[in-house]
Amino acid sequence: MLETTKNLALSVYFMLPSCVPATGLDESGAVLEAEQLRPYYQQPRVLGLAELMNSYGTVRADEKILQKICDCTAAGKRIDGHAPFLSGEELNAYIAAGVQSDHECSELHEAMEKLRRGQYIMVREGTAAQNMESLLPLFREPYCSRCMLVTDDKHPGDLLQGGHIDYIIRKAIAAGVDPVVAVRMGTLVPCQYFGLAHSGAVAPGYTADLIVLSDLEQFTVEQVYKNGKLVAQQGRMLHPAALTVDKARFARVFDSFNMDEITPEQLQLKQTGTRQRVICLTPHALLTTEKIVPFCQHPGTAPGVDVAQKIVKLAVFERHHRSGHVGLGFLGNYGLQCGAVASSIAHDSHNLIVAGTNDADMVLAGNTVRKNKGGLAFALNGQVVGELPLTVAGLMSTESAETVEEKLQALKAALKAHGISEDIDAFMTLAFVSLPVIPKLRLNTYGIVDVDAQRIVPAVF
């Protein structure tokens, strides 16, 4: 990625992955220790250590985590945080370890506590996680000098239609924020935070990376300059970069699925009991809640599924080492009334996640993604209704953003027609259900994870 982004009409910087796997209760395709990361700090476009999501291990002085922090600090680079709802003494310990920012704040009191303790706050407004409205009081002095704008995950269609940071600035201005403050939070503050001393402002001695706007209300970008040269106008690149794909050199990336075909037997619940634990989604957020309900069985659906109560079955299949590990659980508020959805985008280990109302469609959707070596799929009544192959590591496509968006919208439309909740993104929200560092419950290949306690809890009991 460093190599292929060298000569673009865009400055691309990187933060090193700090937690692969996210915690000890996760199963990833690789394990990245401090020694593997250390050489990359010499790269000028590597700005530091990315979101330190294992806050549980950090505050308990995990030696491997502390070594990564020490290496990054010694290189004079930034350490980003990821610590939803961390507070009090544990937050103090986390910050004292060297973590300098956080992008997981969904409530104002949480952001204020972290600001008071010296962290920068990244105000997130993406596809699934939308926190700007809750954090609007930060868009003024004295807070705005320590706050910046970020998107986290965002669908290609949202980027094409609304934009990236410019979309958040536009939305903030519409909410009454001073345009100068909004622009500052989207440009100067992040450059100051990441140590990009000659970027982020139109001033003597600064790199001539700038945009020309229609006005400060609509905030329509009319021209883009890179190093003083006009590179885009009226929403189009003047000289688009040619896409080259060396499949021989990156064969491992294009063949990232190492798992056997899914069978119905893998979806059979091993646990028994009279109650079931449901991972309940939260509208426009990544947080989940826990709900305990009587174990349900209805004709035509898998045991534990109750479409009237918006409860579907959930499975995560390990896809990197052919271990055969499968975690099973139940997902609430997803809304799907029939069929099954599968995705190889499943943060952060990106195993294969499948949600559905019946085992047969779950098997079909999962095997469709496996056959395509990654991507998304929707199966209904034994037929594949739609699919989007993502052949680059099971996460990305070599097709244009426009082509990917067209296929994605067709999939999402089909899912909306079959019950997906209006305030839930069918794929983006699902992709975070397996990340065992955002409260309250997650599902990975080991089972349901209680994030706060960092332990596996039963789905049925």
Language model region names:
Residues K6, Y41-Q42, T73, I95, ...:
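Alpha-helix boundary recognition
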Residues S11-Y13, D80, M148, A377:
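A structural signal for isolated positions on well-ordered beta-strands in alpha/beta enzyme cores
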Residues L47-G186, C191-A201, L210-D215, T220-Q234, ...:
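Active-site core of metal-dependent hydrolases
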